[in-house]
Amino acid sequence: WRADATETFDFYAFNIGDYMGSVEQSVSSETISKVLYPNDGTSAGKELRLKQQHFFVSASIQDMLRSLDKREIPVEEFPDHWQVQLNDTHPSVAVAELMRLLVDERHIEWDLAWEITTKSIAYTNHTLLPEALEKWDLQLFKTLLPRHTEIIYEINRRFLQVVRLKYPGDDSMLSKLSIIGEEGNKSVRMAHLATVGSHHVNGVAALHSELI
C-alpha cells in the first residue's frame, strides 16, 4: 500500500511564500508508507509507527471488504472468505479496526460484529516476556485513534465482565488480564487485544504454544 495526500500542493501557502508548507501535507502523508519501522525512541517515531500500523491494517481490511462487495457476498460471511493472521502484535489494531468498519461503516450491531471479528482473526504470539510485549501510551493512542480507543474500552469492559464471573473478587486477575494497562501511564496492551479478539492463539513452537 502507498499513502498519498488528498492535496499534493497548497497553492495558497506557496503564494504567501511558505514554500515548505506548500508541500508539507504531501510529504507528511507519503512518509507513512515510505520507510517502515522508524526508530520509536522519539515521540515523532512512535507516532509514525502507530500511524503505519493503522494505515496498513485499515487498507488491507477495507480491501477484503471491497472484494466481498464486488462478489455481492454479505459481510456476515466475511470469516468464510477471509482469515486475518496477526503475526506478532504489530497488526493487532486490526481487532478494533474491523469492529469499527463493521459497526460504524456497515451498521452491524455490536454482538454480530464481534462474532464476525473473532471468527476472522488469529494471533501468533512471539514472546511471553511482559516487558517485550507491545504497549501503546493511551494518550497517544487516543489522540491518533479516538474511535478505536472507544471500541477497545468497550471490548475490555465486556471481556472483564466475563473475567469477574470466572474469578469473583480477584482484582489482581482483572488488572493482569485487562487490555488497558493501569501501571504508571495508562497503556493499550496490544497482545491482550490480539488474544481477546482472536479465535485461535498460538506460539512459534509447540512448547511456546503450551505455555501460552
Language-model features: locations:
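A conserved ligand/cofactor-binding region detector
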Residues: W1-I212
